[in-house]
């Protein structure tokens, strides 16, 4: 299989890796979490006295910044390998602008979903979970080997989307069960929200791209 070039994909991978290296070499891990991670209670205004801290930027900015921070090297490596492979194929189909839209929308949706799930939580949310989930869904939709088939009253595309979503939810629940005992927190809400973004946006954006070509 020939790998598409994917310039935006390479840039996104490069940015994520560069930020990780700078944070860890500079010893800025704690500051990066405080300033860049998404803290649901901060976004909802439920921080209480802790909200008096002089943050660098408004809480809404962390809907994006959290997606460029990673807990450790294995977290970064896992996300970047998926992005490196799936991202360039989605970019091939949609073009760099629309692929970037899917990626950033997935990141924001993931952050909002985690906030809605635990609005008063002080646990920081880090990682490109929502963005990567959106790219995975886009890859599954745009490069499916078999044509979708209707299921009962459900049209083919909706039926396939529902099947993929159920599969994705099941996979995430299995991951949470398998790794939860090791203290690893799986951002299930972010994964699901990002995946839905990819399911919903990918084919309409593909049609839009070639309609305007």
Language model: regions and residue ranges:
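A detector for small-residue-rich transmembrane helices and their helix-helix packing motifs
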Residues: 1-213
